[in-house]
Amino acid sequence: MFHRYIAQASNKPLLRLFSTRSRVLTLFDEKCRSCGIKLQQESPDKPGFFKLGTSIDRKKPKYISEANQKYNQFLSKLDVSDRDLLINNFNVPKNIATKPISLTISKQEENPTVIEKDEDIHSDTNPAELLESDYTCIRCRDIHHRSKFTMNAKEFVIDELDKVLSTIPNDSPLVYVFSALDFPMGINPEIFEHRDPKDLYFIMTKTDNLFPKSSGSHHDYCKTFLNDYLGKKYNVPPENIFIGSGKKRWRVKRLYEFIPNYSYFIGHTNCGKSTLIKSIKVAEELKKFPGTSHKKDFGKTDKLIDKSFANVGPGVSHLPGFTRDIMPVYINGNKTIYDVPGFTSNTYLRNIYEKLDSKTIAHLFRGSLAQKKATYKSQYITVKGPNVLSIEGIGFLEFPENTMYQIRNSTDLKLHVFRDITKVESLLYDVPKSLYPVFLLQDQTPELSQFNRYLVPPFYGIVDLVLENIGYINIKPVGAKKTNSLVKFYLHPSINTIIRQPIMNYINKTFTGQDEKGNPLPKRDWNRLSTFYLSRYTNEDPFYSKLIPTTKADVNEYEQVNSFVSNGREYNSEYALTSDNKFDFWKE
């Protein structure tokens, strides 16, 4: 049996695009519009299974009540003058004819204009684009509509960079997307072994977690910092660098012009590629409504924007590995870009997500506004050694005795302070229900012996402890220094981490510690009298450092530090860190 698909566009006749269901799938290359997997109907247990269900070729006719049907029948028999008496149009000028809405709808539904020949399809209409929102696999439907998923390697494939690049033509433009939440963890230096820096385009997304507006000094300072970092470290030209936000749809019109045609969007899993592509697509779709504001705001256009965001472009999800295959996205018939599955080098990435529901995963990745939570003006908590700072039970910072720190939280995770590491270890055997609100995994939290154990390299001044895809914790030592013992960090194996210089120093102006005449000021007067300056990246010192892997059997932490850097310097209990040598034991 033949099925008809009736589509109506503004000022265009209705089109019959397809005659059979198989023709639909052939034109769409048999791919899920949400994740890109090849669709199949044979095996429910294999990836890509889908059911047609209620689709565009099975749309139910609009329900019209019996009373309205009778009304329309009588109304259609009246002449225009009698019909005008039945409706409230006394304030309408006499020369403007008014047609009852109910009658108009019924006539259109009763006698649609149908073109029966395939060759009558407009040449500027891309069939794949029209079908973009029609067919999704069972996995994607369950995720989006039921919040139901099983995190495994079969349904959520996450490969390494080399394997992902092997699926992309060598001469195709690459757009590398990375997140502002965990910069620079999202940039894999191996990409420069495959492509020349001048042939790569870089986009920092999720910048709404760093500053609140898409324009202004913070945006400009951030762009300057990225130009310095990528330019001096990797020789990327500044015209190949862009910053924006897919979630807030910042600068998407400029982004549309920035990306080359037929480019492939690559990046770490969960970095925001699909959301960014979707935002570009939505911005172009909204051009069809010239009288409507395209800004996402708390106004009347929200429903239009949100509906467009739900119905066009690739699917988006907080789940890592959601996109499963390369997916073409057609934008306005003028540009084609490809959404590519994310990559990672962390083989344990899925472990934590197997134990979480979709709402909790969204909370894990949400982040918070650093401009509000992680500057010198922000609220902080004070932790004294040997206290342990819990990062909602997925990480534990153990501080040395006789030390004190101010902690500012730029994640969405809850912080909680415990007496010492012994107390934490005993709790993890059986987490009390009263502590469930501050333990992400609650009763499924592993014992401390199953966490990865690190030493934080020696640091001087403020540092950011960065958690991949999650955000960062700002750590500031305060008080007199009495020990060279190191901070220890216990972290769930599904998460990677680094420390870095405070990123806010590069997108905010900071204190010089001097007055307007250049005279040094005591710290108590900095807030009131100090001048400001903007830090610039020079590539002379490390911007970040890996943490030092360790085990419980390792006793001498000084030996571990020296073995980690192997630069001839010896860290010990007497070593004095200053502003001149503070990066001696950092390793990128």
UniProtKB/Swiss-Prot annotation:
<feature type="domain" description="CP-type G">
    <location>
        <begin position="158"/>
        <end position="346"/>
    </location>
</feature>
<protein>
    <recommendedName>
        <fullName>Genetic interactor of prohibitins 3, mitochondrial</fullName>
    </recommendedName>
</protein>
<dbReference type="GO" id="GO:0005525">
    <property type="term" value="F:GTP binding"/>
</dbReference>
<comment type="function">
    <text>May be involved in the mitochondrial lipid metabolism.</text>
</comment>
<keyword id="KW-0496">Mitochondrion</keyword>
<feature type="transit peptide" description="Mitochondrion">
    <location>
        <begin position="1"/>
        <end position="32"/>
    </location>
</feature>
<dbReference type="InterPro" id="IPR050896">
    <property type="entry name" value="Mito_lipid_metab_GTPase"/>
</dbReference>
<dbReference type="InterPro" id="IPR030378">
    <property type="entry name" value="G_CP_dom"/>
</dbReference>
<comment type="similarity">
    <text>Belongs to the TRAFAC class YlqF/YawG GTPase family. GEP3 subfamily.</text>
</comment>
<keyword id="KW-0809">Transit peptide</keyword>
<dbReference type="GO" id="GO:0005739">
    <property type="term" value="C:mitochondrion"/>
</dbReference>
<dbReference type="InterPro" id="IPR027417">
    <property type="entry name" value="P-loop_NTPase"/>
</dbReference>
